[in-house]
Amino acid sequence: MSLQSPKVGFVSLGCPKASSDSERILTQLRAEGYAISGSYDDADLVVVNTCGFIDSAVEESLDAIGEALAENGKVIVTGCLGAKSDVVKAAHPGVLAVTGPHALEEVMTAVHANLPKLHDPYTDLVPPQGIRLTPQHYAYLKISEGCNHRCSFCIIPSMRGDLVSRSIGDVMTEAENLVNAGVAELLVISQDTSAYGVDVKYRTGFWNGRPVKTRMTELARALGSLGVWVRMHYVYPYPHVDEIIPLMADGLILPYLDVPLQHASPRILKAMKRPASSENNLARINAWREICPDITIRSTFIVGFPGETDEDFECLLEFLQEAQLDRVGCFAYSAVDGAAANALDNPVPEPLKQERLARFMEVQESISAEKQRRKIGRIETVLIDDIDGDQAIGRTAADAPEIDGVVYLSGADGLQPGDLVEAQIVNSDGHDLWAAPPARD
């Protein structure tokens, strides 16, 4: 009579970086012979990977822990909210264990203590690319953990610590395994991608027997040699970022940069403890476009930061008009427990925050709609994400999954997720595109 593998349920919340942590835990669980359960009822215990960045995320995480306790009763908590174990235990004293983020060993120790693995399990081999939560054709590639910045609105360093870069050999081996498994797009993520290697003084590592520096430019060049889409996220606008723009112009990596600028007013940027200035950022953006005219620049901003005046906000709107960014997200400032910004004077009233958010989005939507309209008639390469009847849903090089727009492509016969196809853009709105197979002469 064969022994049955112990079963672990898993709930993953939060950002792509948290998803990457979840994938590592799931991979280790499978490597040790644990089965992964898709339901509370069938699981012997449940691991909940939490988010704790803003109050709404804390509430969602606590609700998820409560649901897992109610439905299963045996719960291990990890992730960013786990860094505040007192908050978790005060709300849910019945949890088995609480660990912080990026804590694979601690999670596995807690699992072993509460659900011992089989001594000699007969398990399926874990694939080289590991267990993934994303679709098979794209994957997040985390290159570092933590952050050396101390932005006044952010508590990430207190939860995830200072910057720790992965060795470039490990990153490239993971990337190769993903590509060999059929991944068509690698999304490079971290807390600060442009700082990759700073903590190890850009130490030289090895990949396939070749020396490669632990540095963003060298990493981008190496990833580009794998022959798949490579998309760069969470890039601070440091001067050395200029080095990867020619790689985009040459088609080695996607002409796409996710650059979190957060504001444009010098006074607010200083209060936020953000690097660079709006003037430098604008000059750098213009220089990038000179080198690579097709570059897509995504950014995020915060309105209603403590002390933000009408003049500061107008400065931000002026920057939007001048920068003509392609993809933009914006949030009304929300106090985060433990953030230095909570102590700043002159908080902005909530109704005014929402008014500014609406005005900001109105300006940006006009910019985005015009940029989308200019794509009508162009032939674009589209990565297929999904098939819905006779229609395919995909993305261009200008669109990251989940946060940007999509392309609705008619005539999906024979297509499947992961395919790269040429399509002619026939219509647009401020977010999405509609396309058809290119007209034949």
Swiss-Prot record:
Membrane-crossing segments per the record: none
TRAM domain span: 373-439
Enzyme class: transferase
Catalytic activity: L-aspartate(89)-[ribosomal protein uS12]-hydrogen + (sulfur carrier)-SH + AH2 + 2 S-adenosyl-L-methionine = 3-methylsulfanyl-L-aspartate(89)-[ribosomal protein uS12]-hydrogen + (sulfur carrier)-H + 5'-deoxyadenosine + L-methionine + A + S-adenosyl-L-homocysteine + 2 H(+)
Residues annotated as domain Radical SAM core: 133-370
All copies of domain MTTase N-terminal, residue ranges: 6-116
Name of the protein described by the UniProt record: Ribosomal protein uS12 methylthiotransferase RimO
Listed Gene3D superfamilies: Methylthiotransferase, N-terminal domain, Nucleic acid-binding proteins, tm_1862 like domain
InterPro entries cross-referenced by the UniProt entry: Elp3/MiaA/NifB-like_rSAM (IPR006638), Methylthiotransferase (IPR005839), Methylthiotransferase_CS (IPR020612), Methylthiotransferase_N (IPR013848), Methylthiotransferase_N_sf (IPR038135), NA-bd_OB-fold (IPR012340), Ribosomal_uS12_MeSTrfase_RimO (IPR005840), rSAM (IPR007197)
GO terms (BP aspect): tRNA modification
Organism: Methylobacillus flagellatus (strain ATCC 51484 / DSM 6875 / VKM B-1610 / KT)
Any matching Pfam family: Radical_SAM
SMART domains with a match to the protein in the record: Elp3 (SM00729)
Entry binding sites for [4Fe-4S] cluster 1: C15, C51, C80
